Amino acid sequence: MCGIFGIVSNEVVSSKNLDILAHHAEQRGRDSSGLYFSNEDRFSLYRAPCSISKLLRKVNTDSSKFIMGHSRLITNGLSDNQPVYQNSVCVIHNGIVVNHD
């Protein structure tokens, strides 16, 4: 199981709104988490073997207007932790993605 959330705003995302969304996502899994967000003109990606609440305490999202988050029960190990970023594309999904040639 996993929880997914995202915020896109013209204003900086409030920590209160982010905490509410993270709390709801955490109901679906607490073993690993990930965040992808913008601080001004720079994007940051974090993945961790802890709850989304713990991860949020370790990163600075104070100037973010765009945040995607993922919280899950580990089913395939930490190597499958999300978000996944490759070739300028960031993906968070609910399911299993199998690589294709």
Task: Map each language-model feature to its residues.
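N-terminal glutamine amidotransferase
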Residues: 1-100
